[in-house]
């Protein structure tokens, strides 16, 4: 377990970077966040959690939720059913690209861009009676926090600005790769993105990625092989168009969200969550990436 002093050092080290990024402003509910926040939490495979900075302050997890939705789909479907509808390749286009969906005849490149996550939400919607409730149940169980909830204001705000995601869903539907009612699936998808969690919650919830598929309670969520495969996808496609840069600087599987959170994993050891709302040009937390880079250097850890 890293010492508390190291986590505090990591937070202090990146503080001068504040002001260099830009808070996501495409929906009003995200634009109002205090840009000066910085937090980090780590959870070890032994179940210990340590944090520094604003690590107990909840934020909108946004695309980090795509890890949970894919994990949930893996517990409900045969893998062939999932991968026949969504690919495993890095995108190279923006996370909300319509062009790629058109060129590749309705099959999204990976589950971590919007098109791919919408297909996963469609799969969950068709298999579960109450997909929003099931997701809430899962993340509360994984984080050991019954107070985790959806931020209704964020979900509503995203729905009001959903034209592009609706266009992606209808385009996939035209290619036969979207079964459900678009409006219903969009509402489910936006609720997933609007989950509100803090760094401690997320570092605990993602521990299964570091612990061969076993959650913080020791329950097997997905198999060891599936965990390794999921980490491989996170390493290649978890950070939008910044995945290569992140692999170079941090060297861990990770997933970011435009709320400023990033989760990362050192397999066999620990799961990490950092948060700083200001984003770089790729939509990844600027100071968050720097925190992970500094931590990986100080710990001497990389998967490469």
From Swiss-Prot:
What's in the keyword line of the UniProt record?
Answer: Hydrolase
Q: What class of enzyme is it?
A: hydrolase
Which residues make up the binding site for substrate? 63, 114, 158, 165, 189, 240, 258
State the InterPro entries in the record: Beta-lactam/transpept-like, Glutaminase
Alphabetically, which GO biological process terms does the record hold?
glutamate biosynthetic process; glutamine catabolic process
Q: Which Pfam families match?
A: Glutaminase
Taxonomy, superkingdom: Bacteria
Name any one GO molecular function.
Answer: glutaminase activity
**What EC number(s) is this enzyme filed under?**
3.5.1.2
Q: Which reaction does it catalyse?
A: L-glutamine + H2O = L-glutamate + NH4(+)
Q: How does it assemble?
A: Homotetramer.
The entry sums up its family as follows: Belongs to the glutaminase family.
What protein name is recorded for this chain? Glutaminase
* Originating species: Shewanella baltica (strain OS223)
Query: What gene is this protein a product of?
Result: glsA
């Amino acid at each position: 377990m890293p010492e508390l002093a190291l986590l505090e050092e990591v937070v202090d080290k990146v503080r001068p970077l504040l002001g260099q990024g830009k808070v996501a402003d495409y929906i009003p509910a995200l634009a109002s966040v205090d840009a000066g926040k910085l937090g980090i939490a780590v959870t070890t495979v032994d179940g210990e959690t340590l944090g520094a900075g604003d690590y107990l302050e909840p934020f909108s997890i946004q695309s980090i939720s795509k890890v949970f939705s894919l994990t949930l789909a893996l517990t409900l479907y045969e893998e062939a059913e999932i991968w026949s509808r969504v690919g495993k390749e890095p995108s190279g286009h923006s996370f909300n690209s319509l062009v790629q969906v058109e060129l590749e005849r309705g099959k999204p490149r990976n589950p971590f861009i919007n098109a791919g996550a919408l297909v996963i939400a469609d799969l969950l919607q068709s298999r579960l009676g109450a997909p929003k409730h099931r997701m809430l149940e899962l993340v509360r169980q994984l984080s050991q926090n019954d107070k985790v909830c959806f931020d209704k204001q964020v979900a509503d705000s995203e729905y009001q600005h959903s034209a592009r995601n609706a266009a992606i869903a209808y385009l996939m539907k035209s290619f036969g790769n979207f079964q459900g009612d678009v409006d219903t699936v969009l509402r489910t998808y936006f609720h997933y993105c609007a989950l509100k969690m803090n760094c401690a919650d997320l570092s605990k919830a993602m521990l299964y990625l570091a612990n061969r598929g076993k959650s913080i309670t020791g329950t097997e969520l997905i198999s060891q092989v599936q965990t390794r495969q999921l980490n491989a996808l996170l390493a290649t496609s978890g950070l939008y168009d910044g995945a290569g840069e992140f692999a170079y600087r941090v060297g861990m599987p990770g997933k970011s969200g435009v709320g400023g959170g990033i989760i990362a994993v050192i397999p066999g050891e620990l799961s990490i969550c950092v948060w700083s709302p200001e984003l770089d040009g790729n939509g990844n937390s600027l100071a968050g990436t720097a925190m992970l880079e500094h931590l990986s250097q100080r710990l001497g850890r990389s998967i490469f």
